[in-house]
From Swiss-Prot:
Alphabetical list of NCBIfam families matching this protein: PRK04387.1
Organism listed in the record: Staphylococcus saprophyticus subsp. saprophyticus (strain ATCC 15305 / DSM 20229 / NCIMB 8711 / NCTC 7292 / S-41)
Family membership noted in the UniProt record: Belongs to the UPF0223 family.
The name this protein goes by in its record: UPF0223 protein SSP1692
Gene3D superfamilies assigned: BH2638-like (1.10.220.80)
Domain of life from the UniProt record: Bacteria
Amino acid sequence: MEYQYPIDLDWSNDEMMQVVSFFNAVESYYESSVEGEKLLDRYKQFKKIVPGKAEEKQIFKEFENSSGYSSYHAVKAVQSSPDQKLFSAKSK
């Protein structure tokens, strides 16, 4: 799938890589499966870079508009079932 990740040019290279890593975990949730702990760890790193709720919503919306994948729903699915190890949108 061809699309661009929502990246802020003010972020450092390391921050950009961490944000992309989070979105890669979201992609795994929709395309195959992802470990819940891995997705939440990457989300925590994302939140260190994007602490504001409004900015998070904007970035999530940009990503969903370009990819079709809802970061919000992926994170909520994992948070709502803390005992489950693997998560996938395909197994719903």
